[in-house]
């Protein structure tokens, strides 16, 4: 019989779980999770962005997701970044070819952006984690 717990647990296990939580009676080794500690490497340079649109759906980033962005990290080829192009924030995969800078969506209906010297593209930071709402 599956029972819903009326209140949140006092603390959350901090271990890897493959398929089950084990016995609810055995709470040894339980500590509180600090998502700041787990997810954020550079607290002064981290911020959250709410994703709008489906341009990065094939990368698992959907409309309404929260993206954790780290501005202290160097953006490398192939990483998902938040960038500003023509005064618009974009979530795209960064591409570098020779001296050219590209922003690619995973949705084939969204055109790639290749920055020339005339374009104003500013990479704000690297997306390190994506937070999804799965219920509610």
Located regions from the model:
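Short, positionally conserved secondary-structure boundary motifs
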Residues: 1-57, 77, 88-89, 96, ...
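Short coil-to-beta-strand transition motifs
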Residues: 63, 85-90, 121-122
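Structural motif
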Residues: 64-65, 79
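PDZ-domain C-terminal substructure recognizer with occasional recognition of PDZ-binding tails
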Residues: 90-114
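C-terminal structural segments of small proteins and small subunits
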Residues: 110-130
